[in-house]
């Protein structure tokens, strides 16, 4: 990455923003020096740290990083014999040791949980050297405010100093209280000169008090006298202070020599906490600004390293995808854009009006690549996927060089020449207004030749232009894609949205009109443009309208599909509940029959015993016959009661199935008017292609449609729209009819996880389970976000939370239903 590219894209401002989230001065300095990397392993490790820190941050379990003054400057020369740190230096070392101690305290609960041990931040903190001994050593010398402890060897000297000071104060008070001397003094308080206590005496009393004169006032009216009886005491005080300083120096030297033994650990810990502070800053920025860590795409394999989101809606593998990307320096005014290139595409040509957002889109793409390769998150949607480039270069804006006397065009060509020289198949090249600044025909020819060369090198190229020929170039090359910035024809202003696959217009005349150019000039301009240009303009407008219609149709189709799925799910759930009711009824019936037979068995045993023990009489014979008749009647009653309950269940099941069953098509034949259910469009059968497939004319299109997606129109004379019909599709591949108390999503794709969550919710409701767990892991957070979004939308969820560290931590979510 060249300094020119970093400067043009204002990467230094990104560093400043993230550095502002740092806690330590060393962390800020580290952030401000960070540059994009090309070592994929290092970038992935950095991103993994950020992802895991963000996960802990969202779970309110982030490691503590405390402010502390820089330590490294104090370590210079520390290992020299006799070296002594001052109190400030000792305090800085102590605060570092205290920071490490706090991190290791935070680490303790994580070490007891194997799942949390996989978190890269936990592993990172584990590697920071233990500094408990150093912490205890330093804080036995000073307290946590940086003040000296009450050390025994210093305490004796301080007591001696205090005793001498008390003696001096007592002697001095005599001068201020004695009537004979008090009138000689200029002040009733002693003062200090050169570290010795003196009294201020009026000059006219000179010689009246024996002692040493230290100084005269400027006016000469006062002199400062050290009384004779104080001289020796002052000497003793100065000597005591010197003794104190010598002892303090000895203690500091001894402490410093012990600290020096930990120099390597101090440096290692300092480096680790500095890096952790930078990682934490990027994660806090991500948390505050809805940023994500972009998924990774390996250009060598042309697929996503993490698999998720590596294909577009049509299943085409992607090589570059910005999803709802917002330029980080535009704040809330940034309009989210989507940019994508499939694995076979290499050049994106963006056209459209000035001030429409073309250049901002280019800068966003390039800046995101730089941020991503620094290991930092980007302000975008969760589907964002970026490859790793070994060279990122741009030619943007007015590159005119005044000091080299180069024109705008010359400056551009000089820059482009250097870019072409260095470009390769893992390069990202940004070219703004390629071929401008000179004759349009020649500029356009140069632009196409440059793109030919970059295409041959298989470089990724994002280019903006006003040249109409470059739009045609985009359609004539297989690896090129046209795009445009949207323009609102009603307001005559840009919307700043990117339309993929559609070329744009400059709209110069429309913009001129909006900015007040007189109407007669506007009309004249249209005349000069000519009809051919107007026809092309209308064609492009038509394409844009078709593009919008298609997007609207796709959105409508998705909404209908979601409604179908929800209706189908509700119906399946209802049927499942009925089946559960049927099962409960059968269990209840079996229980009732068991009780019934047990009661009759006991009665029969008693009857047999009576017959054995007594003589057979007519009364006993009649009694047995009566019992048998009663038994048969009771048995018939039980059977009828169960049969009636079963009939009710069967009727409800049948009603549910009939309500949701799609009517069978009558005999299909050529010319029959039909409704395509999945498209909600009318059509006419042309012919049967093969068994179960028909060729259908829909508007101006001919489509091959599956027979089960076709419904015959009731009125064959007039086509009409029909609402889609919900049908129940039984899932024979369902793994279980019972919910799991611990649903594992690890290794699933997004669609599989979504279905597993829905099945779990349905089964939990049917079986009356009020709490279960979801194991989604940490990773890039995709499965975690998907699970939490699902739970937020579900009306059956009472609450959900991350598991406690001892339960599994942030890789697991506990769900309560209510």
Curated annotation (Swiss-Prot):
A GO molecular function held by the record: rRNA binding
UniProt cross-references to Gene3D superfamilies, sorted A to Z: 1.10.1420.10, 3.30.1370.110, P-loop containing nucleotide triphosphate hydrolases
Keywords: ATP-binding, DNA-binding, Endonuclease, Hydrolase, Nuclease, Nucleotide-binding, RNA-binding, rRNA-binding
Matching PROSITE patterns: DNA_MISMATCH_REPAIR_2, SMR
Domain of life: Bacteria
Enzyme type, top EC level: hydrolase
Every Smr domain range: 743-818
One protein family per Pfam: MutS_V
This protein's name: Endonuclease MutS2
Source organism of the structure: Treponema denticola (strain ATCC 35405 / DSM 14222 / CIP 103919 / JCM 8153 / KCTC 15104)
Gene: mutS2
